[in-house]
């Protein structure tokens, strides 16, 4: 766990094509098994923006937050904005947290810690993501019939594929 003045952003270097390792590697399943929410940036700018949100989400929820890093993103360069006002972090004040908070504490027995994680922390992270619009509809229509859900580098790949097919936001 974490504290309101701490926060943990756990970076995982995924290697889907096994370019740098003997086996392909994907962190999503390990993060999920450990009840760690995952942020997956699609660009160098999003590494900065979502990194700030990751620390804030960790502090708010008391959870570690996973950060999926793929070579196409982290081994690239870009011009980015470092304006401190670029990312508007909203710390929710309308979520029913336990009276003693969600932060790690000693000497709580492991069952109490696990119950706090399953009863509050996961939902606090989801609430943080909702309030800060971390998951959003990018292209909408009045009568949607089909949806594509994607994140990170695959978001850029899907947008490129749609563009290659001549499909735009209309």
Where are the predicted features?
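Thiamine diphosphate
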Residues: 1-59, 70
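Flexible, low-complexity linker and terminal segments
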Residues: 41-170
């Amino acid at each position: 766990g974490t504290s309101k003045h701490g926060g943990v952003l756990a970076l995982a270097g995924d290697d889907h094509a096994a370019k740098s390792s003997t086996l392909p590697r994907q962190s999503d399943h390990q993060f999920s098994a450990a009840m760690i929410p995952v942020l997956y940036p699609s660009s160098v700018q999003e590494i900065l923006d979502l990194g700030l949100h990751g620390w804030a989400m960790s502090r708010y929820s008391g959870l570690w937050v996973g950060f999926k890093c793929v070579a196409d993103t982290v081994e690239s360069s870009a011009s980015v904005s470092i304006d401190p006002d670029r990312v508007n972090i909203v710390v929710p004040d309308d979520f029913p947290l336990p009276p003693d908070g969600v932060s790690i504490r000693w000497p709580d027995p492991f069952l109490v810690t696990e119950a706090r994680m399953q009863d509050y922390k996961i939902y606090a992270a989801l609430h943080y993501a909702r309030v800060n619009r971390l998951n959003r509809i990018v292209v909408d229509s009045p009568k949607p019939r089909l949806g594509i859900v994607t994140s990170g580098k695959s978001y850029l790949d899907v947008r490129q594929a749609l563009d290659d097919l001549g499909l735009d936001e209309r």
